[in-house]
Each structure stands twice: as structure tokens, then as C-alpha cells.
């Protein structure tokens, strides 16, 4: 038994000090370390100050908080894996404690999958906003918080059934390596999330196309200024969620496909157990997304803001001539007198 353990320790040493593996650990730790302050800055500088409706804003805040928590957990997990080898006294010190692995591993992969649930919430909220465009801005913030709860609960239930009988008896040197008894079912769940988000992305594109036709139809009719403005707000916020959804799907899809390919191709393709284990331990796509999304968020919001101002000045404008101009003048005058009367009383 001791010989088997020592063999595993020696294998762990060879994997840990493999050049590709060491670089990937350092890369993921570094990217995550930059992503954490970047996400915090983005949330306080842009996200909390968004002009979007409270329902969508709640979903976006919950989404970015889950990404932030994932980045924090990656900092700990990959920081541990990168720095611990500098202080080991024997090869067996590289083997992660069973209890520590259990809690860190499940937390990391739970936070990997949780953000993938929120794009579905974006679509539901956006369709609701379009269907109730004329009065949506006056509706209280309710559907957003409800969706956050109902999107997280299924992930919790799935994880409970995935890991309820897991004993974690394997030997692990990485928090990202799945136990063999759970790997197949978890990979199936990843495929499900990937297909779900591909379908959701198509739904978002359809939403924008329908919204564009809906917007043109409204502009042809004599709609109120507030309705036109609300339609424009829905258009801009929907474009932002589409950008977020597409970017996340791109990186998550790359991560999922590569991870499953490594398992499917197996040890023969990589030439040895060491090389195969190194490939399983590399995790760069989603951690990179955690940093990239900060840049994407700032740039896309800046561009959408400028387009929004242009649209407001061109399509959502107050006419001052003709019969419509006279009605607008009467409405403004009446509102001013009503305000003065309320102040007087």
C-alpha cells in the first residue's frame, strides 16, 4: 500500500513540475488575480450605475457576482497549486487533502456552471420587457430577483444528485480534476449547459429581430414619447445582454469542448499518463473570460451609450411644428401648471 501511495506521489511530482502544467497554473492564477479587482471596479463604476430596468439590473448584478466569486475561488485554488510546490518536503505533500479538495473542488465547479444559468434569465426578462414595452418602466423590480432564485436552485439540485454519493477516494493534485465516478455525469451536464446556451443565443438574436420590426411598427404609428424612449432602452439593454451571452458562450464552449475531448481522446492520444494528466489539469479558457468580460463590458456599454444618445436625438425627439407640435406644447404647459399647482398646495 505504501508503495502504491509513493508511486502516486512520484507521479504527482512529475505532473506538477511539467513545464506546460506549471505555466498553465501560473497563467490561471495571474489572470484570476487581475480579474478580481477588474470585476469589482466594473461593478461599481458601471454595473451599479446602469440605466437599465431594475429586473435586468438585478440579473446582471447576480451574474457578475457569480463570476467574481468564481474568479476569487480560482485565485485560491490555482494559487495553492502554484505556490505549494515551492515549500514541499516530500513528493506526497503535493497530494491535496481530501477534505480540502472536497469543498474547494465542488465550490469551483459550482461557480463555473452557475453563471451559465443567467443568460436564460436575460432572455425571459427581455421578452417580458418587449411584451410590456409601453408600461414596463413603471413595473416594480420583481421578476429579476425571482429569476435569480429560480435559476440558481436547479444548479444546486443537480449538484446534490451529482455528488451525493461521491467518496473522493482518488488522489488529486489539482482542484479542477473531476473524480472518475462523477466525471461522466458532470460532462453530460456541461454538454447540456452548452446546448442550452446555444439555443438561448439563437433566442436572443430572434428577440432583437422581432424587436426591430416591433420598433419600426411603433414608429409608424403615433406613439407617445415615453413609449418610444422605452423601446429604445429595451433595444440597447438587449444588445448588451446579447454581447455578454455570446462572449461567455464562446469561452465556456471552448473550455467544455477541450475538456471533454481530452477525456474522450484519452491516454493513447497524448502518449503517456503524465501528458494526459497535464492536459486534464490545464484550465485557461473560462478564467481568461473572467478578465476579458471586464474589457468587453466597458467597451460595449460605452458604444451602446453613444448610440443611445444618437437614437434619442434622432428617432426619439419631440416635434415642435404642426399639429403634433401644438399637442406637445399643450402637454408640456399642462404638466408645468400641474406641477406648480401641486407645489402651491
UniProtKB/Swiss-Prot annotation:
Glycosylated residues (UniProt): 5, 97, 180, 275
Keyword Cell membrane on entry: yes
Regions of this protein lying in the Extracellular compartment: 1-22, 80-103, 164-189, 263-280
Single GO BP term: sensory perception of chemical stimulus
Annotated compartments: Cell membrane; Perikaryon; Cell projection, Dendrite
Record keywords, A-Z: Cell membrane, Cell projection, G-protein coupled receptor, Glycoprotein, Membrane, Receptor, Transducer, Transmembrane, Transmembrane helix
Tissue: Expressed in the head sensory neurons ASI, ASK and AWB. Not expressed in male somatic gonads or sperm.
Cytoplasmic side: 44-58, 125-142, 211-241, 302-345
Topology class, membrane: Multi-pass membrane protein
Top-rank taxon: Eukaryota
Summary of the function given for this chain in its UniProt record: G-protein coupled receptor that antagonizes the negative effects of the gcy-35 oxygen sensor on spermatogenesis. This leads to the maintenance of mitochondrial function in developing spermatocytes and/or spermatids prior to testis maturation during the early larval stages. Regulates the navigational capacity of sperm during hyperoxic conditions ensuring the proper targeting of sperm derived from males to the fertilization site in the uterus of hermaphrodites. May act in the same signaling pathway as the neuropeptide flp-21.
Protein name: Serpentine receptor class beta-13
Native source organism of the sequence: Caenorhabditis elegans
Lineage of source species: Eukaryota, Metazoa, Ecdysozoa, Nematoda, Chromadorea
Amino acid at each position: 500500500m505504501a508503495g502504491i501511495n509513493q508511486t502516486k506521489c512520484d507521479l504527482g511530482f512529475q505532473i506538477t513540475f511539467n513545464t506546460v502544467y506549471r505555466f498553465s497554473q501560473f497563467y490561471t492564477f495571474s489572470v484570476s488575480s487581475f480579474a478580481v479587482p477588474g470585476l469589482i471596479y466594473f461593478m461599481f463604476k458601471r454595473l451599479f450605475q446602469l440605466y437599465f430596468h431594475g429586473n435586468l439590473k438585478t440579473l446582471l448584478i447576480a451574474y457578475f457576482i457569480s463570476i467574481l466569486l468564481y474568479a476569487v475561488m480560482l485565485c485560491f485554488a490555482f494559487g495553492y497549486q502554484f505556490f505549494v510546490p515551492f515549500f514541499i518536503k516530500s513528493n506526497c505533500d503535493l497530494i491535496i487533502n481530501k477534505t480540502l479538495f472536497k469543498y474547494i473542488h465542488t465550490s469551483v465547479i459550482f461557480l463555473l456552471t452557475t453563471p451559465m444559468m443567467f443568460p436564460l434569465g436575460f432572455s425571459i426578462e427581455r421578452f417580458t420587457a418587449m411584451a410590456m414595452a409601453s408600461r414596463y418602466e413603471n413595473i416594480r423590480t420583481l421578476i429579476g430577483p425571482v429569476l435569480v432564485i429560480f435559476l440558481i436552485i436547479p444548479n444546486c439540485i443537480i449538484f446534490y444528485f451529482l455528488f451525493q454519493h461521491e467518496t473522493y477516494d482518488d488522489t488529486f493534485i489539482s482542484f479542477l480534476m473531476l473524480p472518475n465516478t462523477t466525471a461522466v455525469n458532470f460532462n453530460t451536464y456541461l454538454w447540456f449547459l452548452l446546448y442550452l446556451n446555444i439555443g438561448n443565443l439563437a433566442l436572443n438574436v430572434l428577440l432583437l429581430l422581432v424587436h426591430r420590426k416591433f420598433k419600426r411598427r411603433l414608429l409608424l404609428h403615433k406613439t407617445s414619447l415615453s413609449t418610444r424612449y422605452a423601446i429604445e432602452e429595451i433595444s440597447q439593454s438587449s444588445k448588451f445582454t446579447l454581447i455578454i451571452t455570446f462572449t461567455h458562450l464562446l469561452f465556456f464552449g471552448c473550455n467544455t469542448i477541450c475538456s471533454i475531448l481530452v477525456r474522450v481522446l484519452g491516454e493513447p492520444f497524448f502518449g503517456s499518463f503524465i501528458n494526459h494528466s497535464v492536459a486534464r489539469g490545464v484550465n485557461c479558457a473560462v478564467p481568461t473570460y473572467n478578465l476579458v468580460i471586464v474589457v468587453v463590458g466597458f467597451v460595449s456599454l460605452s458604444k451602446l451609450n453613444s448610440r443611445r444618445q444618437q437614437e434619442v436625438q434622432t428617432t426619439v425627439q419631440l416635434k415642435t411644428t404642426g399639429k403634433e407640435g401644438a399637442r406637445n406644447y399643450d402637454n408640456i404647459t399642462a404638466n408645468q401648471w400641474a406641477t406648480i399647482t401641486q407645489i402651491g398646495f
